[in-house]
Amino acid sequence: MIKKTLYFGNPIYLSLKNAQLVIKLPEVVKNETLTGGFKQKAEVTKPIEDIGVVVLDNKQITITSGVLEALLENNCAIITCDSKSMPVGLMSFVWQYNSE
């Protein structure tokens, strides 16, 4: 199966729920005038096992350590960019161990 590349260039919240990547927009989460139904529709989930590369290109991205762990365990590369949108960091899976 072909893995997907996810690019995030705007402020975003990334978390994990039921082994799925949860993507939320901070503008929607913080807006108190919106209805709960609209807020729920603004939340997108993606299966972790379908993701191959994640590019983080904004300083206002919030990502949990659970997301990082799940992505790396599924051999996903995580790339961070600077203010000029140039890659400055790469996080990838390092060690696989067996407890036999």
Task: Describe the role of every protein-language-model region.
Residues M1-V53, D57-E100:
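N-terminal intrinsically disordered, cationic/polar leader segments
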